[in-house]
Swiss-Prot record:
NAD(+) binds at T25, G26, A27, I28, N279. This is Acetaldehyde dehydrogenase. It catalyses: acetaldehyde + NAD(+) + CoA = acetyl-CoA + NADH + H(+). Keywords: Aromatic hydrocarbons catabolism, NAD, Oxidoreductase.
Length: 308
């Protein structure tokens, strides 16, 4: 069921600020902290990493955030927070969740761990409801799920192939360690939200210079596909995604016989990322949107972490 009607009002003008912590200080963590800092509904109280010399910790300090190189242990010692973002790795998140679960904090997982409830805002809605662990699937999942969901709701799709390409210099260590988990989590999400069981997922890490802007290409088998009808469905889905990720666009959409090909590009809208790092931008934008919606939830009980 699509809950996209709620997206227009997903960022209320007045909300009670939610205290948050971020675990992970790589490129995705830096951009996440930047987006949180711009959000009137979120108050970043702690950024936790492992390397005291990391650029991510230095950046967080420059924004006035409390920082630590003690990782999850520091978050547990300083808790409770309203929201904890985990921007580490799938394996690390599996270790973190049993420690965070008893705290009652909303955990937003940006790794392909498959531990929590999958969220793609324009498909599932942005409210966390009663879930305490929300999983953002993957960058390719955030780019592809809205389109494959819309296609399958309108046409008899029999096969889906999702090929995403990211620039090498924004594919960090965790991304490279998570390749198997990425394929599994993205495939699971595509099948879950499209109902199509025959699915193939590919992730390319491109060393091209200049760096390649993040792209996701979707190939779909749709009997007797009508090009105009397909394009209309895809454009509507893309417009909804742009409500929270404005750099999301449809570059091409073709239909010939039973083969539909859709090319999506995401340009980062970020204070810290290069424009080609749309893979990080789209998943972070979705994560912040989930947190903002949670902050605005009626009856939410606030928690207090370390002072900023």
């Amino acid at each position: 069921m699509s809950l996209t009607a709620g997206l227009t009002d997903a960022r209320p003008d007045t909300v009670e600020t939610a205290t948050v912590a971020v675990i992970g200080t790589g490129a995705i963590g830096r951009d996440l902290v930047s987006k949180i800092d711009r959000s009137p509904g979120l108050d970043c109280r702690l950024v936790a990493g492992r390397n005291p010399e990391s650029a991510g910790l230095r950046y967080a300090e420059s924004l006035g955030c409390a920082t630590t190189a003690a990782g999850i242990d520091a978050v547990l010692a300083a808790s409770p927070f309203d929201v904890v973002f985990d921007a580490t790795s799938a394996a690390s998140h599996r270790d973190h969740w049993p420690l965070l679960e008893p705290l009652g904090t909303l955990v937003i997982d940006l790794t392909p761990s498959k531990v929590g409830q999958m969220v793609a805002p324009t498909v599932t809605g942005v409210a966390a409801e009663d879930a305490r662990n929300v999983n953002l699937i993957s960058c390719g999942g955030q780019a592809s799920v809205p389109v494959v969901h819309a296609l399958a709701a309108r046409f008899p799709v029999t096969y889906l192939e999702v090929v995403s390409t990211v620039a090498s210099d924004v594919a960090g260590r965790a991304t490279r360690l998570n390749l198997d988990e990425y394929v599994t989590a993205t495939g699971h999400a595509v099948t879950t939200f499209s109902g199509v069981s025959d699915v193939k997922i590919i992730l390319n890490i491109s060393p091209a210079v200049p760096p390649a802007t993040f792209r996701t290409v979707i190939h779909a088998r749709v009997p007797d596909a009508d090009a105009a009808a397909v394009r209309a469905v895809v454009d509507r889905a893309a417009e909804q995604v742009r409500s929270f990720a404005p750099g999301y666009e449809v570059v091409a959409c073709t239909a010939a016989d039973d083969l539909v090909t859709i090319v999506l590009k995401v340009t980062a809208c970020s204070d810290v990322l290069p424009p080609y790092a749309g893979n990080l931008d789209i998943i972070n934008a979705a994560a912040v949107l989930v947190a903002e919606q949670y902050a605005a939830r009626p009856g939410r009980v606030s928690r207090t972490g370390v002072s900023s």
